[in-house]
Amino acid sequence: MYEDILLTPLDSSRKEEINSPQDLFISFLNKLEGWKTKCKNLHWAAPKKNIHVYLDEFLDILGDYQDGLAEGYMGILGKMQPNVIKGTPSDTLNAMDFIEEVRSDTLLFYNKIPQETIYKGITSECETFIQNINKYKYLFGLCDIRPY
């Protein structure tokens, strides 16, 4: 009797289905929000000052990129609802795994950005973000990084 009204909890690890440009951008903005939290956590848990400083710098880059992407999205597709950004958690435990996750997911996002001319600014900003990711991958590799 009650089985018919009970809901199955959502699995937070399930893959989101991307059906529209709105879904694509909101999904990636949620990843960026989650990465900001993960970057802060890794920054606070950093074993050495060098990686602590680089994670702090990369956090600023993440935030600036997320803000520009969100504003560009809204300039094209209209305002988003105030409760739509919820942050997708990251389970990485060190800076190198973290930057690799950011890199691979950003490249997937980049390849899905619509090709219409109106999206070229977003594409260009994403290319700059990819360049920053590559830079910080190199810098993180110079640091003493051990699993936490």
PLM regions and their residue ranges:
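Long amphipathic alpha-helical segments
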Residues: G75-K79, L139-Y148
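Hydrophobic packing residues in well-ordered alpha-helices of helical domains and bundles
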Residues: F25, L32, L55, I99, ...
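Disorder-to-helix initiation segments
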Residues: E17-L29, W35, T92-A95
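Charge-dense, intrinsically disordered terminal/linker segments
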Residues: M1-L24, G121-S124, P147-Y148
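Acidic/histidine-rich alpha-helical segments that form the ligand environment
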Residues: I85-F140
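Helix-loop segments that flank and shape redox-cofactor active sites
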Residues: G34-E57, K79, K112-K120
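Long, well-ordered alpha-helical segments
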Residues: F28-W44, L69-G72, D105-Y110, I133-C143
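Conserved alpha-helical segments that form or flank metal/cofactor-binding pockets of metalloenzymes
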Residues: N50-Q81
